[in-house]
């Protein structure tokens, strides 16, 4: 099939494709968020009842929280290395199966060692999904709304956290922690069949690999635009593919700073989501009351991110990300000052926007910073290197709890980390090789006549 024979399909077809793509991607990321937060909801049970997996100290609990994140780092980096060669759709399907299997195996764990191994295994699938989803979304949605759609998809992370927290409050006593993990295995049953039918490949990626006929077929079927001639000229300036492109002079400074931003964002995200229920329980709240703080943290992230993403589309993500980091620092400091419960919950919601929500915005920032040939690698770099921060977050919280220090120390440390994140964000250089889809909205598409 010749790409020159394809004309631009009706907008309705493209709108349906975008809707399905965003829905599938959001559900996949929601279960990722569920997986990464559900551990914090069951941590008090595992620490208080040695009959579950054995005796677990605070230090061991922090390490168990980090094993999944080590897996995420490995999965993101591996998928980033191959994602710009193998495509977005194929890897998303593989990773849905992978992390679902990991959750089911974790539910059957009979020892701390087996549980740790399965958390690592699950993390590999989650990391792969996080790395490939942002690239697919960036290449399939309208350029003018990339940050908004990215925020919708990655708001699945805090939405999954809300789901994990609510289900733990409602059903943890009835189905136990193993039942909560079995819920995390459902995507292989309810999401995979849908993704097999409705999830498209990116025409932009297909063109970048020289598969013009395949790209034209996807374009004709889904309405996803082919890249413009200006896009292709821009892509030819990027001589290397994948991680090799990240080390070029064009990208190296920004890549380093974006990695630090993600490191900070994920340190805050996983430090708080792992230890907030335990800290609030130690502060005198009952089990369900302490989980309520986790619900509000993630709820604030969902709402705040959707609002912030609109500003990011209009004014650019850089200043918006720096601002949300700053909001996190302020909220965490104020959280130590003994305000009434209503004020504390409001501060937790703001902290959710500034921590979990900021990381969502960072994914959007990163996915639109790189050219197609380096996009999956760029997202994978930030998701992978950032997981080092996610690993240290729970460990830092565990060390503070083990040392018997004031809970305020935890919040002060995380507030300082947020200030660092804001400062680093402001120094990221402008992307000289950013996607030019918005700037070339009226340009002729590759293989499509301008009059089509």
Question: Model-derived features: where do they sit?
Answer:
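Intracellular cytosolic loops and amphipathic helices of Major Facilitator Superfamily
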Residues: 1-11, 196-254, 436-452
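Cytosolic juxtamembrane N-terminal segment immediately preceding the first transmembrane helix
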Residues: 1-34, 38-39
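Extracytoplasmic gate region of multi-pass secondary transporters
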Residues: 40, 247-305
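Extracellular/periplasmic helix-loop-helix junction of adjacent transmembrane segments
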Residues: 40-74
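Helix-breaking motifs and short loop linkers at transmembrane-helix boundaries and internal kinks
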Residues: 87, 108-114, 142, 338-339
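Structural signature of the two symmetry-related core transmembrane helices
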Residues: 90-104, 319-333
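Cytoplasmic helix-loop-helix junction between adjacent transmembrane helices
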Residues: 118-155
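Glycine-rich segments within core transmembrane alpha-helices of 12-TM secondary carriers
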Residues: 147-173, 187-188, 385-393
């Amino acid at each position: 099939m010749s790409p020159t024979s394809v004309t631009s399909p009706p907008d309705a077809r493209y709108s349906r494709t975008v809707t399905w793509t965003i829905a599938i991607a959001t559900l996949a990321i929601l279960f990722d968020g569920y997986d990464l937060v559900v551990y914090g909801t069951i941590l008090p049970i595992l620490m208080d009842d040695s009959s579950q997996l054995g005796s677990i100290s605070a230090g061991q609990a922090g390490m168990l929280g980090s094993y999944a994140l080590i897996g995420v780092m490995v999965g993101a980096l591996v998928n980033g290395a191959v994602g710009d060669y193998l495509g977005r759709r194929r890897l998303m399907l593989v990773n849905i199966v992978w992390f679902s299997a990991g959750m089911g195996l974790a539910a059957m764990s009979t020892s701390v060692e087996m549980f740790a191994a399965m958390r690592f295994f699950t993390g590999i699938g989650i990391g792969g999904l996080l790395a490939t989803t942002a690239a697919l979304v960036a290449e399939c949605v309208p350029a003018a709304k990339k940050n908004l759609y990215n925020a919708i998809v990655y708001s699945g992370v805090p939405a999954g956290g809300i789901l994990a927290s609510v289900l733990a409050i409602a059903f943890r006593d009835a189905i136990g922690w193993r039942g909560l993990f079995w819920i995390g295995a459902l995507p292989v049953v309810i999401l995979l069949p849908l993704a097999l039918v409705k999830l498209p490949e990116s025409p932009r990626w297909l063109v970048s690999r020289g598969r013009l006929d395949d790209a034209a077929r996807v374009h004709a079927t889904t309405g996803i635009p082919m890249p413009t001639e200006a896009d292709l000229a821009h892509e030819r300036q990027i001589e290397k593919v994948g991680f090799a492109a990240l080390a070029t002079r064009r990208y190296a400074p920004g890549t380093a700073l974006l990695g630090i931003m993600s490191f900070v964002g994920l340190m805050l995200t996983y430090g708080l989501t792992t230890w907030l229920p335990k800290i609030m329980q130690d502060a005198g709240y009952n089990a369900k009351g302490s989980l309520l703080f986790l619900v509000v943290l993630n709820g604030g992230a969902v709402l705040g991110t959707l609002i912030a993403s609109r500003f990011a589309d209009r004014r650019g993500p850089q200043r918006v990300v720096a601002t949300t980091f700053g909001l996190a620092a302020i909220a965490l400091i104020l959280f130590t000052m003994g305000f009434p419960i209503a004020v504390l919950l409001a501060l937790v919601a703001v902290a959710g926007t500034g921590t979990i929500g900021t990381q969502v915005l960072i994914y959007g920032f990163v996915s639109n910073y790189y050219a197609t040939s380096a996009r999956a690698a760029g997202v994978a770099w930030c998701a992978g290197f950032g997981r080092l921060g996610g690993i240290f977050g729970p460990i830092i919280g565990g060390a503070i709890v083990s040392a018997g220090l004031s809970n305020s120390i935890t919040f002060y440390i995380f507030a300082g980390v947020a200030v660092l994140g804001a400062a680093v964000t402001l120094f990221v250089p402008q992307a000289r090789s950013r996607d030019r889809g918005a700037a070339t909205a009226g340009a002729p598409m590759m293989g499509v006549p301008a009059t089509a």
